Amino acid sequence: MSSGTPTSSASPSESSYDRTRMRQWARGRARSAGIDRRDLLKLVAAASAAAPLIPAAASPAHAAQSLAGVVKPLPPELFTVRGTNAETNFSALRDTGLLTPADRFFVRNHTATPVVDATDWTLTVWGDGLAGGPVDFSYEALRALPAVSRTAFVECAGNGRSFFTSQQGQQVGGTAWTLGAIGTARWRGVRLAEVLRRAGIGGHAVDVLPRGLDAEVVSDGTNLGRVRRPLPVAKALDDVLLAYEMNGEPLPPDHGAPVRLIVPSWVGIANIKWVGDIEVSAEPLLSPWNTGLYRLFGPGYPAEGSAPLARQTLKSAFELAPGASFAAHRRHLLTGRSWSGGAPVRSVEVSTDGGTRWRPARLRDESRPGSWVRWNTDWVPRETGPGVLLARATDRSGRSQPATTAHNTQGYLFDAVVRHPVTVV
């Protein structure tokens, strides 16, 4: 069983990369792309102090309307609106198959969804990590390159954040996600490595920094610029996609059209949407999204925070609404999904008595890296009244979901077993 302390499942090379970048940044040796280093220091200072959760900003009546800044409709039976974001209701996934339909896929925006015409779109690859000058790729040119498809989940690093407070009584900052800030799709596109090689990436390249076309982010009066986050060149040349299709259709605007990054198993912020340019650098790069944001701060972590977050953690969710009602003395089929950024899911256990007894669930899918598995189990409740359902996954690395997750002030990487309330009548 896990100790409950968040640990990275990243390979040694990923971990050493992150820690090296952290030391370089702290000593002023890494270039902060697009923001003054003093402002980055302010972000780190702010991140070390917990702030209240940002609650859901809409009643069901409001949620039925379109959210400003989001293109697709957000009916309340499918989504819960949380600030400028939309969380998928897990109960809406019960009969959808392995892949999450685009109309049920969660939306995480830092600003408003830009609507970009693919015919006018150009991807510019530039920087001193190239052997030559900048290289442009049109949408048609990108689609003409060898294509690959990959099934992968995209999950916000803060998915499950609300349970730090509701289950563990701890204060954290950020959007109060439950477990619906995740979706799995079949992505089609071109390998980022293919584009970088055609652009002339040099052997001296160190970092690759994709940047989105959404509006600049302003936080507490500081302009952080457009969303961007560097990847180590080794990762950029590995399994990363520049995706232009989602579940066999062109990307919808809210999910990155015309082209987005897919970084399998990594935290959602690495999967930059609406990519407009990619900087290839011969020196380390940093941005607000891997210094003051998307790191672990709080008791047990260095003052400057943990290494930047990379791989996602292990979670399970029931395909049920909170407080779902069940008839006593009847057989019910409980369904859910489990996933891990570290290794494929090996097994799932379910408890219907608050954790006293556990039994194995039936896995419905072949477990694969970077995807989730569906599972089910039968339940015949005997006693009426309130109850709690629990699901606990174990992945092939041997890691299981713990009873609690070590606190961090921004509420990232919650991996503890979630208590799902139900009522038996």
What name fits each language-model region?
Residues 1-35, 62:
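N-terminal secretory signal peptides
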Residues 49-53:
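Hydrophobic core
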Residues 64-425:
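Structured, non-membrane catalytic/scaffold regions adjacent to prosthetic-group chemistry
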